[in-house]
């Protein structure tokens, strides 16, 4: 990861705290929120689920009265998607700002962070039978011209090569034009917390042992007993996948722990790779060192940007 620090040109209206699993990002986010009259918005793809507490590391005791959003917003077994996250983020961001508080986005789910920081335009656009009937007699060139008129900022030229994709692109572009764009203008300050690889591995293994002692096996048993299928638990990955296999008798307890521990280490590497990709794509991440008072480093960054 680069050591370069880039800062926003305008005063931030969103603080983003990101990092790999077990990096201490939640603790840092809560500490900063407490000093900023802030509220936490979670950017974790599994913490949205009710009852999936220990395995997802909600660690709600760390919040110490700081309000939080996008945790426990969907039932276990439900498939929560990126569009739903973005819609709920927008609602939470708007609500927090309207009350004069400061939004602090905290998480490690790269796609969720990316969709906020890069402003993905995700819209649930219904099919428009009348529009499709109108477009049906048009040639490919005529359809392409209409799409460019509807979306002058078109960047994805692949939409121009297949008729069905072209019609759908027009449908989306014209729907958005009528509905307007309610995405806020964000000026984020993004802070990442990182550790040396060996230190992070040690933290991951230590935390996994603690979660096992806290009742993570029983949590998965309870979720299954309440109707979350083994297949759904498998879908949620990592802790839920390997504990489900253990509970089904496919793995011994020792094998389950070793395989899960290894999988979490691999996941942390993938997160770090995603953050590098975010930087390559132009997102400025200001890194603080986890083993050297990350709060003081983050406060120094905030002082320079407020």
From Swiss-Prot:
Record-annotated site: Interaction with substrate tRNA: 109
Binding annotation for ATP: 19-26
A molecular-function term among this protein's GO annotations: tRNA dimethylallyltransferase activity
Record-stated family: Belongs to the IPP transferase family.
Catalytic activity: adenosine(37) in tRNA + dimethylallyl diphosphate = N(6)-dimethylallyladenosine(37) in tRNA + diphosphate
Region: Interaction with substrate tRNA, residue numbers: 44-47
Record protein name field: tRNA dimethylallyltransferase 2
Quaternary assembly: Monomer.
Keywords, comma-separated and alphabetical: ATP-binding, Magnesium, Nucleotide-binding, Transferase, tRNA processing
Positions annotated to bind substrate: 21-26
A single BP term in Gene Ontology: tRNA modification
Function summary: Catalyzes the transfer of a dimethylallyl group onto the adenine at position 37 in tRNAs that read codons beginning with uridine, leading to the formation of N6-(dimethylallyl)adenosine (i(6)A).
Pfam family name, one: IPPT
EC numbers: 2.5.1.75
Co-factor requirement: Mg(2+)
Source organism of the structure: Citrifermentans bemidjiense (strain ATCC BAA-1014 / DSM 16622 / JCM 12645 / Bem) (Geobacter bemidjiensis)
Top enzyme category: transferase
């Amino acid at each position: 990861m680069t050591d370069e620090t880039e800062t926003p040109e305008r005063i931030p209206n969103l603080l983003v705290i990101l990092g790999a699993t077990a990096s201490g990002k939640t603790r840092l986010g809560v500490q900063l929120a407490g000093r900023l009259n802030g509220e936490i918005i979670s950017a974790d793809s599994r913490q949205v689920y009710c009852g999936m507490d220990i395995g997802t590391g909600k660690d709600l005791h760390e919040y110490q009265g700081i309000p939080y959003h996008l945790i426990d917003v969907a039932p276990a077994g439900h498939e929560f998607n990126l569009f739903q996250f973005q819609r709920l983020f927008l609602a939470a961001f708007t609500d927090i700002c309207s009350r004069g508080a400061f939004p602090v986005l905290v998480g490690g789910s790269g796609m969720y962070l990316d969709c906020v920081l890069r402003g993905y335009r995700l819209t649930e656009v219904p099919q428009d039978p009348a529009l499709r009937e109108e477009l049906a007699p048009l040639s490919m060139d005529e359809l392409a011209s209409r799409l460019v008129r509807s979306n002058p900022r078109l960047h994805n030229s692949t939409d121009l090569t297949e008729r069905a994709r072209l019609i759908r692109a027009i449908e989306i572009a014209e729907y958005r034009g009528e509905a307007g764009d309610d995405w806020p203008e964000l000026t984020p300050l993004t802070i990442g917390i990182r550790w040396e690889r060996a230190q992070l591995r040690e933290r991951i293994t230590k935390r996994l042992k603690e979660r096992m002692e806290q009742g993570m096996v029983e949590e998965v048993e309870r979720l299954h007993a309440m109707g979350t299928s083994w297949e759904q638990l498998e879908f949620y990955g990592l802790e839920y996948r390997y504990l489900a296999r253990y509970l089904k008798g496919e793995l011994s307890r020792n094998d389950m722990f070793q395989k899960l521990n290894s999988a979490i280490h691999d996941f942390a590497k993938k997160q770090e790779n995603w953050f590098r990709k975010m930087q390559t794509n132009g997102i400025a991440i200001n890194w603080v060192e986890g083993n050297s008072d990350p709060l003081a480093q983050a406060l120094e960054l905030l002082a320079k940007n407020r």
